């Protein structure tokens, strides 16, 4: 199992990229924005893991089962409420607990609708051209002494990938 990590505002277009085995399991919130995301993800054949505000332990149980099944967990480090481009989730602890490696993904399209929300979420428009860019390396959380160093590496790689993809489109 691996954790696929992408900034939240690139999320909408990136769900179209996964046509492989193992299964990709995005984490979505029970908030109404998350419910919209779930509808879109299911339409494209993904099977999201629901993060319910009142039942956080159910998500951990589902992640554990997905990890045992060899599924890939898809997570946005700056979600669900931001701030944009800052890590506010426990990716380090999650990756260590389930012995997962971390892979960076970025997405950009030439035509999109931008929401006026906390992260300026970009929704690709029909017939636009897009590009997916996977990170240069697979990040092993076991090679880091603490969460702070791991998060610094993750932010560096996410931003380097974002910068590189901006040069294409």
What spans do the regions from the language model cover?
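Pre-Walker A (Motif I) flank of P-loop NTPase domains
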Residues: 1-6, 70-73
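Catalytic core of membrane glycerolipid acyltransferases/transacylases, capturing the structured
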Residues: 3-54, 98, 113-114
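Well-ordered alpha-helical segments embedded in enzymatic catalytic cores
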Residues: 10, 59-62
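Non-catalytic C-terminal accessory region of glycerolipid acyltransferases
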Residues: 19-22, 39, 43, 61-169
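A conditional alpha-helix N-cap/helix-loop micro-motif detector
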Residues: 53-57, 84
